[in-house]
Amino acid sequence: MSSIRNQNDNRRPTFRDHRTPQFSGRGGSGGGGRRLQNPAHYPQRRDMSPIRRSSAISPVRRSQDHRQRSPEVRRHRSPEKESKDAVVTSTGSSRGATSASVTSSSRRHESGERHRETHRREDKEKKPEKSTDRDADRSNNIAARIQAPVVSSSTHHHHSNRHENRKSTAVKRPAADNRPMTYSTDVSVSRHSENRRKSSSDVSRRHGDKEKRDRKREDVKKKSNGERSSSSGRRREEDHKRKSESSRKEKKDEDVKEKVVDENKVEDEAVEMQGLVEVDCCEEEETIEQAKEHGSDEPERPESHQSAHSAAVSNASHHSDSEEELDYEEDDIDVDLDGDIDVETMKMAARGDLKVDDTTDEDEINDVKDETMEEQKEDGEPEKKKPRTSENDDKDKKHHGSSSSNSHRRREDDKDRRQSSDHHKERRRSPATRQRATDHKESRRSEGTSTRVESAASAAGTEIQRIPSLLTMRIAAPPGIKKLETLYHSGSGGSSSSSSHSSEMIIVGETFSNRWCQCSCAHHLPTTSSAAAAAGSLDASPASSSSSSSNSDASVSRIPSLMSLRTPFNNSCLFLAPPPPPSSSSSSKRSHEAAARIRAPSPPRRSFGDRGNRSDEHHGGSRHMDVGPQRRRLQDHRVRDDGRRVSSFEDRKRPERGFQDSGRVSLSLKHL
């Protein structure tokens, strides 16, 4: 009985385990009665501490099993000892015939040895490369050597850990994490497991060392194997040879791979270096430079971002010269234009006004540019800046040595120019005409026929219906136009035409509300008064210049950009509609139109905290304020616990939590 009990001791305890170990009988549980024995008499099984845990005393079978032995212990066994074992196995039978001293016990020992031998061989066949590598690594890896616990007996090492860990799932001493912590995308965070521990200088040297060591071991084994010509010995030798050869091959392959990878890296770096004449410490400009060199259309963006922000909108201040732009640099705006792009179109792209279908080609874009220029001329305003054509760009490149510095200078100019108000007006006016719908030709025709103000009005009126599909939409477009942002976030006061602002907000909201935001983040607007208000705002728009301009503005960028919405939004919200305006809170909180009510209204939330103090949120809803908190609480209990009441899903959904959750024990006790 006791042996069985010992095997299972480290599993769940019985109630008897809590008695003091002195009084537990020999077959009993506590320490098995063994605690008071002096462990010095049993050196082969000695434990680290004099208090002997029954879990450390394991059945004999397990102590002899080589698989539980820690690699350190196995490493310290000398080759002579191993050869001795082998000799016993091979020649035992013949010796048994001659000498009478071979008792049954020794024979049993031999059979055990033989058994273990086969085990070991199978194991090696299963994982040939692993075992040697692990040993060698153990000896190499200094950190592991320092951290490894001193092992007196392998069984104790194995079990005591198990014993202490029984309740926790966590590993006791996790390996030190060697991976480089980096936020940059280009460096892969988890490197290949083989390269992790090696510094590049050490790699080859260590490989060499390992091979030398392997050779030495083989020599020793050959010497010791000289005497024995047994089949098992031969087999083991062959296994070993095969193993070492395979490991060597693997090492060679790894080396080759590493070399190839390194060469690729070097080439990449060289390519990066080639285009750069003068670098202004901004990574953006490097990417622009490369783009101009290789004629790629992708990384043209960053420069345009910086120039496109107006001072109020840009996320990084202007003084940090676009070093830390937010993370929409990679792949958000997908405008494909071939060759050089002039600054104007790049700005349009950054603002999100320029919609390019996959089919459009250069001349269409040029047409649109020409239209905008003509309209500016008709306006009678001296045109401030011509859209930059590729020839101009080339001239610039010839005049000023490096185009990276050139782009820098251009950006500075833009900054200076941006500060002036007339530039604001011009910028505000032009986008409405530049707006390009997916039904490209129709919109262009309508724009061509109408005059300027009419086009603005039509843009506000007709294009509201066009809600972009996910494909055309750019969720993380760079920051939008300044006016639009103030439009979303303007308070009640602060601007002269606040009324027109609110009406415009409703227009924009109406765009999104009908099938826009699927999540509960309150970014869709209740569209109660929106139609009338929209009509009113359209009529009233010519009244004041600011309102008209901002009106066209609102129609220009349908989709507010992520960055221009400074409000917190929850991440489940894919489509960001503008948040409801603070001014129009007169309408009811929850509108019950089909558009606004996307999911069924949830039951009112009850807080976990001090339930007693809340007057409005309790089950009754229309309960009188004057009823004391004690009575209300009692009623609460009665309602909840009444057996005859049909339990609905909502009751089961949020069970009443215990007092320790509320954190205000004294309060809740007072109320009881």
Swiss-Prot record:
Cellular component terms (Gene Ontology): nucleus
Biased composition (Basic and acidic residues): 8-20, 62-85, 107-138, 189-226, 234-268, 289-306, 366-375, 382-396, 410-424, 436-447, 607-626, 636-659
Subcellular location: Nucleus
Tissue expression from the record: Highly expressed in intestinal cells, lateral hypodermal (seam) cells, Pn.p ventral hypodermal cells, and spermatheca. Expressed at low levels in the ventral nerve cord.
UniProt entry keywords in alphabetical sequence: Nucleus
Keyword Nucleus: yes
Biased composition annotated in UniProt, kind: Acidic residues: 322-343
Biased composition (Low complexity): 87-105, 307-317
Residues covered by region (Disordered): 1-463, 576-672
GO biological process: one example: locomotion
Domain of life: Eukaryota
UniProt biased composition (Gly residues): 25-34
Its biological purpose: Together with unc-5, involved in touch neuron axon guidance. During gonad morphogenesis, plays a role in the unc-5-/unc-6-mediated migration of distal tip cells along the body.
Descriptive protein name: Protein seu-1
Gene name per UniProt: seu-1
